[in-house]
């Protein structure tokens, strides 16, 4: 029960704080490194529910940001839909076409349908790899101020604010939990836990308690 409780706490709290709760509640003395080991061993078996979007037009936002791995700058790539759901995230050493392609290919498999509009920054790799989200996916550059856009005879006001706000959340999460990773594997594991945490918080805010409970049960039934 100590390990199970530690994993649930670590999804929401820094590893250095979790041992304090374990000691107060169970008088169990464990190190923060042990908590991290437990999470790495068991929590990554948690599978997020299948992505489901019933909207006629699916709009996604994509962006990348810096993150440190072994003291060197790498890139955290994220894609989310227009409803605030994080679809996928990866961390790679380079800000290039291959990384963008990997993100969008894996995202397309998770989405299970074509994306209609991809809102992005000026990185050319997105333009070249947008086809992996669907043959007819429209790749559109938009900044914080936004701009008008016509798609299938309908007017849309598009902005890349959702990506910028997500990057701010990632920065806060990194500052709170970890700002440098030992290797690329641990960095991507951390990105997966970030997605899990975001999904759980969204489930709870939308009162989808059964879905949140199912994910937490996965965390403790190992």
Residue ranges of each PLM-predicted region?
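Helix-centered, glycine/charged polyanion-binding patches within enzymatic domains
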Residues: 122-179
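The start of beta-strands in P-loop NTPase/AAA+ ATPase cores
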Residues: 58, 76, 83, 115-116
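Short, surface-exposed basic-aromatic patches at helix termini and helix-loop junctions that form
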Residues: 80, 106-110, 130-138
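Basic, amphipathic alpha-helical segments enriched in Lys/Arg and hydrophobic/aromatic residues
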Residues: 168-222
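Mobile genetic element proteins and their domesticated derivatives, centered on retroelements
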Residues: 6, 18, 35, 63, ...
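Short, positively charged, Gly/Tyr-enriched micro-motifs
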Residues: 1-59, 64-70, 106-108
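A short, conserved beta-strand element enriched in hydrophobic/aromatic residues
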Residues: 76-96
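Active-site beta-loop-alpha junctions of metal-dependent nucleic acid enzymes
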Residues: 41, 89-113
């Amino acid at each position: 029960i100590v390990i199970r409780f530690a994993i649930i706490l670590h999804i929401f709290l820094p590893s250095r704080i979790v041992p304090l709760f374990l000691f107060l509640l169970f008088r169990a003395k464990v190190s923060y490194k042990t908590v991290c080991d437990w999470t790495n061993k068991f929590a990554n078996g948690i599978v997020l529910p299948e992505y489901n979007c019933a909207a006629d037009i699916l709009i996604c936002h994509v962006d990348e940001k810096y993150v440190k791995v072994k003291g060197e700058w790498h890139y955290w790539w994220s894609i989310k839909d227009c409803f605030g759901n994080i679809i996928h995230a990866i961390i790679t050493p380079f800000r290039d076409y291959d990384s963008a392609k990997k993100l969008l290919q894996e995202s397309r498999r998770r989405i299970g349908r074509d994306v209609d509009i991809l809102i992005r920054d000026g990185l050319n790799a997105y333009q070249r790899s947008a086809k992996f989200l669907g043959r007819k996916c429209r790749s559109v550059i938009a900044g914080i101020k936004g701009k008008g856009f016509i798609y299938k005879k309908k007017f849309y006001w598009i902005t890349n604010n959702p990506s910028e706000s997500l990057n701010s959340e990632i920065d806060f999460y990194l500052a709170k939990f970890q700002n440098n990773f030992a290797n690329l594997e641990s960095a991507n594991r951390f990105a997966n836990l970030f997605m899990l945490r975001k999904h759980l918080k969204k489930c709870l805010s939308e009162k989808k308690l059964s879905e949140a409970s199912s994910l937490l049960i996965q965390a403790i039934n190992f």
